[in-house]
Amino acid sequence: MEVNILAFIATALLILVPTAFLLIIYVKTAK
């Protein structure tokens, strides 16, 4: 279970970090 949880967290970070980065750029560009 621990390995699966770590893999899930790592995957979530890989998805959320670029998404958040793109959202920040979009907000700055929109303004």
UniProtKB/Swiss-Prot annotation:
Cellular localisation: Plastid membrane
Q: What are the recorded Gene Ontology BP terms?
A: photosynthesis, light reaction
* Keywords annotated in UniProt: Membrane, Photosynthesis, Photosystem II, Plastid, Reaction center, Transmembrane, Transmembrane helix
What is its membrane topology?
A: Single-pass membrane protein
Record's keyword annotation contains RNA-binding: no
Q: Which domain of life is it from?
A: Eukaryota
InterPro entries with a match to the protein in the record? PSII_PsbM (IPR007826), PSII_PsbM_sf (IPR037269)
- What residue intervals traverse the membrane? 5-25
Provide the assembly information: PSII is composed of 1 copy each of membrane proteins PsbA, PsbB, PsbC, PsbD, PsbE, PsbF, PsbH, PsbI, PsbJ, PsbK, PsbL, PsbM, PsbT, PsbX, PsbY, PsbZ, Psb30/Ycf12, at least 3 peripheral proteins of the oxygen-evolving complex and a large number of cofactors. It forms dimeric complexes.
By its UniProt entry, which HAMAP family does this protein fall under?
PSII_PsbM
Q: Which family does it belong to?
A: Belongs to the PsbM family.
Job of this protein: One of the components of the core complex of photosystem II (PSII). PSII is a light-driven water:plastoquinone oxidoreductase that uses light energy to abstract electrons from H(2)O, generating O(2) and a proton gradient subsequently used for ATP formation. It consists of a core antenna complex that captures photons, and an electron transfer chain that converts photonic excitation into a charge separation. This subunit is found at the monomer-monomer interface.
Name listed for the protein in its UniProt record: Photosystem II reaction center protein M
Q: Which species expresses this protein natively? A: Cuscuta exaltata
